[in-house]
Structure formats: structure tokens, C-alpha cells
Amino acid sequence: MAHKKAGGSSRNGRDSEAKRLGVKRFGGETVLAGSIIVRQRGTKFHAGTNVGLGTDHTLYAKATGKILFEVKGPLNRKYVSIVAE
């Protein structure tokens, strides 16, 4: 009976592909309607004025304007809004 495992049988070598999440457009930037602002898992950022929430929690601009990030409410939630120009 062999006392050493045969070579070439590593059980490592798998990893998931990066999902490219995060903020795509920053505060003060001008965006067009339909632009993706944040890609996220869950609602780290909440949708404010003129911002829509996709089925995968992606935030996108519903109107053309400047992005405004703000913290408000009793739970100090982060909101993303679009100020129309």
C-alpha cells in the first residue's frame, strides 16, 4: 500500500470571477438618463430622487443631471439622488 498520495492531484485551483461591483459615477458628475451609478449586492446605497433600483439592486439615473450622495434619516442611510439641471 502506498504511503504517499500520487502526484498531480491538487484539490485547489478554483476561484470565482470578480463581479466588478462598486460606485461607477461619483458625486458632482453629470450623468445621462439610464447611466449606471452603483452596482451592488443588497442596498448599501438607497435610491433617492430621480434614481431607479434594478432587480439586482443596481442604481441608475432616471433623469439627466448631477449626482448627489447624501446620508439622511434616523438610520444614517446613504442615498444617491440626481439633481436635474
Swiss-Prot record:
Gene3D superfamilies: 2.40.50.100. GO terms for molecular function: structural constituent of ribosome. It comes from the Bacteria. The keyword Glycoprotein does not apply. The gene is rpmA. GO terms for biological process: translation. The keyword Nucleotidyltransferase does not apply. Pfam families: Ribosomal_L27. PROSITE patterns: RIBOSOMAL_L27 (PS00831). Belongs to the bacterial ribosomal protein bL27 family. It comes from Aeromonas salmonicida (strain A449). Keywords: Ribonucleoprotein, Ribosomal protein. GO terms for cellular component: cytosolic large ribosomal subunit. This is Large ribosomal subunit protein bL27. Residues 1-20 are annotated as: Disordered. InterPro entries: Ribosomal_bL27, Ribosomal_bL27_CS.
